[in-house]
């Protein structure tokens, strides 16, 4: 039986010390595509958390009844089910966000984090630890997206969650040609790549210092 301490480690390890995007370098494609605004970053983070947590739970629940010959396809079917539910929920209640995210919600099924947690952990442990690990892996992915989204939206549009943060009067105009201008690079996908690279670099520095101690 898994102890409470183990439950705690299943939840907190994927948030930082075993972060799937910063440590394992998984799920970076969507990180580049959906982080132009904070709203889309948060939505994708929540969606991946729910899909990974729920799919890991059911993969674990069915692990003793799933033959190895159909293991992968069974996992894909379970993941697809929750991706469809999330996609339809967003279309029904948050259509504007769903339209902005476009195909990327459906492409959660191809996110390596989701399949990775099902294959490497969920099929080896009981359902509760599997759910905690999967959900926390999604949250770990989500906070990285949030950091990138905050930087990109703030410097690319001057807003956060659609609200004006950088005052309009500081921007360049006909009477104030030397004023501030949004960084157009932040709207483009390469900016997310650079920001993610910096975050991974900082994590590697932290880990190397820990190893030297």
Curated annotation (Swiss-Prot):
Keywords: Cell inner membrane, Cell membrane, Ion transport, Membrane, NAD, Sodium, Sodium transport, Translocase, Transmembrane, Transmembrane helix, Transport, Ubiquinone. One of its GO terms (biological process) is sodium ion transport. It catalyses: a ubiquinone + n Na(+)(in) + NADH + H(+) = a ubiquinol + n Na(+)(out) + NAD(+). The keyword Signal does not apply. It is found in: Cell inner membrane. One of its GO terms (molecular function) is oxidoreductase activity, acting on NAD(P)H, quinone or similar compound as acceptor. It is a multi-pass membrane protein. It is an enzyme of class 7 (translocase). Its EC number is 7.2.1.1. The chain crosses the membrane at residues 21-41, 42-62, 77-97, 101-121, 131-151, 153-173, 183-203. One of its GO terms (cellular component) is plasma membrane. Coiled coil: none annotated. Pfam families: Rnf-Nqr. NQR complex catalyzes the reduction of ubiquinone-1 to ubiquinol by two successive reactions, coupled with the transport of Na(+) ions from the cytoplasm to the periplasm. NqrA to NqrE are probably involved in the second step, the conversion of ubisemiquinone to ubiquinol. Composed of six subunits; NqrA, NqrB, NqrC, NqrD, NqrE and NqrF. Belongs to the NqrDE/RnfAE family. This is Na(+)-translocating NADH-quinone reductase subunit D.
């Amino acid at each position: 039986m898994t102890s409470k301490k183990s439950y705690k480690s299943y939840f907190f390890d994927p948030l930082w010390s075993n972060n799937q995007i910063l440590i394992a370098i998984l799920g970076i494609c969507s990180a580049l595509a959906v982080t132009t605004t904070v709203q889309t970053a948060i939505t994708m983070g929540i969606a991946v958390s729910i899909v990974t947590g729920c799919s890991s739970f059911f993969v674990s629940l069915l692990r003793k009844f799933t033959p190895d010959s159909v293991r992968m396809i069974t996992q894909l079917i379970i993941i697809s089910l929750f991706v469809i539910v999330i996609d339809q929920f967003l279309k029904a209640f948050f259509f504007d966000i769903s339209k902005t995210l476009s195909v990327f919600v459906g492409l959660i099924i191809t996110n390596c984090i989701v399949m990775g947690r099902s294959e490497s952990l969920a099929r080896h442990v009981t359902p509760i630890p599997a759910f905690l690990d999967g959900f926390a892996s999604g949250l770990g992915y989500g906070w990285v997206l949030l950091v990138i989204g905050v930087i990109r939206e703030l410097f690319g549009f001057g807003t956060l969650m659609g609200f004006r943060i950088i005052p309009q009067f500081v921007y360049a105009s006909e009477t104030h040609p030397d004023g501030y201008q949004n960084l157009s690079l932040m709207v483009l996908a390469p900016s997310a790549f650079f920001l993610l690279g910096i975050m991974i670099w900082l994590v590697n520095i932290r880990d190397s210092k820990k190893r030297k101690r």
